[in-house]
Amino acid sequence: MQSVTILPGRDKTGTPEPFQGITLERGELCTIVGNTGSGKSRFIKDVEQLAHGDSVTRRRVLLDGVEIPAERRQSLSSQLVAHLGQNMRFVLDASVEEFLALHAQCRGKETPPVEVLALANEITPEPVALGQSLNQLSGGQSRALMIADIALLCDSPIVLIDEIENAGIDKERALGLLQRHDKLVLVVTHDPHTALMSRRRIVMGGGAVAAVVERSPQEAALYMELGELYRRQQTYQASLRRGDHLA
C-alpha cells in the first residue's frame, strides 16, 4: 500500500461534504483540526475501518485508488492500521522484554528488544527498562514503547494518533521517527505547533471536512517559532521535574 484516498460523504445534517477527496501518501504527516464535536475522531475511525459508504458519514476510503471489498475490510484494517489512543494501558502480564520478543517473533522480525527500547527511550523523558512490567508503565511510557514498536516491528503503514501533545513524550521526535520509517501518520490535535508540522491539514466542522489547507510560507515560519517555544517549554518541564527553580 502506497496511498490512501478519502472520498467525501455527508455532514451531520446530511449535506454533502465540500471537498473533492484527499489522497495521502506513505511517509506523509497529516494533521486533523477542529472544535470538540466537529468530527475529528469520526474521520480517523472511517480511515481505520476503511469505510465503504456504510458509516454514518457515508465516506469511502480507497487503498492505492481501489475500493476494498466488504469481506476483506476487517482483516486489511487490522493489518494496515495502527491506532494510538489517548489512554493507553497494557493488559498483558509480561515484562517489556518479553512483550517485544514475542511481538518480534509473531512478526517474523529479528529486531532485538534492546533496539526497540532504545528508540522508545529517545522520545520519553522517563526511561523504560527491559525488565519492567508492562502494567507498571505510565501512559507516556506506554505510548513511547508502542511508537517504537510500530516503527521497528509493526508492518502497518497507517498510524492514527489522538492528541500526541498530551502523551508526555517528545512529539517532534516521535512523529519524525514514524515518517522516517515510511508510515502515513494522521494526528488529531488542538495544538497549533502540532497542526503546523504537516504540509497539509484537514479542518473539520459540523461532522464534515470543511477544508483541506496547504501550509503557507508564513505558517512554515511560524512553525519554526513555535518549535523554539516548544523546546523551551520542554527545558522548563525537565527543570521542574528535577526540583529546580526556574530562572
Q: Can you say where each PLM-predicted feature lies in the sequence?
A:
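Conserved beta-strand-loop-alpha-helix hinge in the C-terminal portion
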Residues: 207-239
